[in-house]
């Protein structure tokens, strides 16, 4: 039996190389078996790409990453033109191999100690009023990257005192309490952690993660910071039923989560998990009604909704779909 090749620091593994060692194997999709995208998933491209170019140049100038690009988000054009971006800290290489995600897997490099200052200056240069800070999973770090999050929040606020900051954090596997202790020194304005899918699909879609751990992370943060909104997001189209998603919504409310995003899963490549169904806008509307009826203060539900899609409007309680 051949031993797996040792990962080299800083080398990005994608597609087949990324998903080759996960528990539930992904069979590459054949074009004739892939579901055809419905018309409601067509993305309208902007008339001008100048704003997109400006933001990309600002990111490259300071060696920063956006999850918009790294995860191939379908809303990149709209969000960049709107003047918003979700910054991805701690590098662009994840220690997990989730087969729904287009972010590269591998052995990450040491965190850039100057990244918090570079991020703060970039945000100031871009004149942003609301930012989302997320990261890859960093299971290689003792605190899962929590101190780097806190450092980024502190530096951003020093240069941008009026800004609102939302964090979209990983699950801090095995170190939740230590991570929350660190984040308590610089808490965000909105705390977001995505459950992604229903628990019966975790082994297939989120190898290395645990549904209850993720719920506990959200609940424990809320217990420490009762006045800070907590938020979570789910994808549809991975094989779940609407009834399973409804149960997840009830679980989130039982753990005091107040804000919700619900969107359609889109397959990044033939090597990723296939789309098993396209959920209609009417079904998203029904789930939004359910979410609001059980106490979510804000629910953004629609085919192209993502956890950071118009996050500023979500935080203001405005409708996003």
From Swiss-Prot:
Annotated coiled-coil segments of the chain: none
Binding annotation for [4Fe-4S] cluster 2: 94, 98, 101
Any one Gene Ontology cellular component term annotated for this protein: cytoplasm
Cofactor: binding comment: Binds 2 [4Fe-4S] clusters per subunit. One cluster is coordinated with 3 cysteines and an exchangeable S-adenosyl-L-methionine.
A Pfam family assignment: LIAS_N
Molecular function GO labels: 4 iron, 4 sulfur cluster binding; lipoate synthase activity; metal ion binding
Top EC class of this enzyme: transferase
Cofactor: [4Fe-4S] cluster
Reaction(s) catalysed by this chain's protein: [[Fe-S] cluster scaffold protein carrying a second [4Fe-4S](2+) cluster] + N(6)-octanoyl-L-lysyl-[protein] + 2 oxidized [2Fe-2S]-[ferredoxin] + 2 S-adenosyl-L-methionine + 4 H(+) = [[Fe-S] cluster scaffold protein] + N(6)-[(R)-dihydrolipoyl]-L-lysyl-[protein] + 4 Fe(3+) + 2 hydrogen sulfide + 2 5'-deoxyadenosine + 2 L-methionine + 2 reduced [2Fe-2S]-[ferredoxin]
Annotated positions binding [4Fe-4S] cluster 1: 68, 73, 79, 308
InterPro entries associated with the record: Aldolase_TIM, Elp3/MiaA/NifB-like_rSAM, LIAS_N, Lipoyl_synth, rSAM
Keywords for the protein's UniProt record, in alphabetical order: 4Fe-4S, Cytoplasm, Iron, Iron-sulfur, Metal-binding, S-adenosyl-L-methionine, Transferase
The family this protein is said to belong to: Belongs to the radical SAM superfamily. Lipoyl synthase family.
Protein name: Lipoyl synthase
């Amino acid at each position: 039996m051949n031993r797996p090749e040792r990962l080299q620091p800083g080398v990005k593994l994608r597609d087949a190389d990324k998903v080759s060692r996960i528990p539930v194997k992904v069979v590459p999709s054949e074009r004739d078996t892939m579901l055809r995208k419905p018309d409601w998933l067509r993305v309208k491209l902007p008339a001008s790409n100048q704003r997109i170019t400006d933001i990309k140049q600002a990111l490259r100038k300071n060696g920063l990453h956006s999850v918009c690009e790294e995860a191939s988000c379908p809303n990149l054009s709209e969000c960049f033109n709107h003047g918003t971006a979700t910054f991805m800290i701690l590098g662009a290489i994840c220690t997990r191999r989730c087969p729904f995600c287009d972010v590269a897997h591998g052995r990450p490099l040491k965190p850039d100690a100057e990244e918090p200052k570079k991020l703060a200056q970039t945000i100031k240069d871009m004149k942003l009023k609301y930012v989302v800070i997320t990261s890859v999973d960093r299971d290689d770090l003792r605190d899962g990257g929590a101190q780097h999050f806190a450092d980024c929040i502190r530096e951003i606020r020093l240069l941008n005192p009026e800004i609102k900051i939302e964090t979209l954090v990983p699950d801090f596997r095995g170190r939740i309490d230590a991570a929350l202790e660190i984040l308590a020194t610089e808490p965000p304005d909105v705390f977001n952690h995505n459950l992604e899918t229903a628990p019966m699909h975790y082994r297939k879609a989120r190898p290395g993660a645990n549904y209850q751990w993720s719920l506990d992370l959200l609940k424990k943060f809320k217990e420490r910071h009762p006045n800070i909104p907590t938020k979570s997001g789910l994808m549809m189209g991975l094989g779940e039923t609407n009834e399973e998603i409804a149960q997840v919504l009830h679980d989130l409310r039982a753990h005091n989560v107040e804000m919700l995003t619900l969107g359609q899963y889109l397959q990044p490549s033939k090597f990723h998990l296939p789309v098993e169904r396209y959920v209609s806008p009417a079904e998203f509307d029904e789930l939004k009604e359910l979410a609001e009826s059980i106490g979510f203060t804000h629910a953004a539900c629609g085919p192209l909704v993502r956890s950071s899609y118009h996050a500023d409007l979500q935080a203001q309680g405005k409708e996003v779909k």
